[in-house]
């Protein structure tokens, strides 16, 4: 599956970044009960954090791209945690947090940046449940933060 996703990313003009290290006292992923829980990931574009508040100093297109970059980081975390993407069975849920001005109400459209990329990469297995929430501030002034729950196949040596 990893090769197919790498090809699809190339067709889209995208590439997986290196999985980001945690910025505080947590781990990036936890595998439990056939699920991989992925901590909130921030959007990076060419190594720079995508910052700002949607509806104030950033527009919907910027938010969409930021959500897409968060999704890329989620896939990078899957690959790092699982040693590839071969164990990914389906994307179960995304939790999307959008740094929003009080009158910005297009959080679902921002979240589509991540949702549409997951469907492009994983097909029907990439279609997922989702929350899209506006918040007044995010860590490091990030424009978007997304966490995920992913169903995975048992790994080698699993009981």
Language model region names:
Residues 1-159:
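Short, polar/acidic, helix-capping and beta-turn segments at strand->helix junctions
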């Amino acid at each position: 599956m990893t090769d197919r996703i790498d090809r699809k990313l190339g067709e889209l003009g995208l590439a997986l970044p290196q999985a980001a290290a945690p910025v505080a006292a947590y781990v990036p992923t936890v595998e439990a009960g056939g699920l991989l829980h992925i901590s909130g990931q921030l959007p990076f574009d060419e190594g720079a954090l995508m910052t700002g508040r949607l509806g104030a100093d950033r527009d919907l297109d910027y938010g969409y791209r930021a959500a897409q970059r968060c999704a890329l980081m989620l896939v990078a975390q899957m690959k790092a945690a699982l040693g590839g993407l071969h164990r990914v069975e389906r994307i179960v849920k995304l939790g999307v947090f959008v740094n929003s001005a009080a009158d910005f109400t297009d959080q679902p459209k921002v979240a589509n940046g991540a949702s549409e990329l997951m469907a492009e990469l994983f097909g029907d297995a990439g279609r997922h449940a989702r929350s899209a929430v506006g918040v007044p501030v995010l860590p490091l002034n990030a424009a978007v933060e997304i966490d995920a729950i992913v169903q995975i196949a048992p790994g080698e040596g699993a009981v």
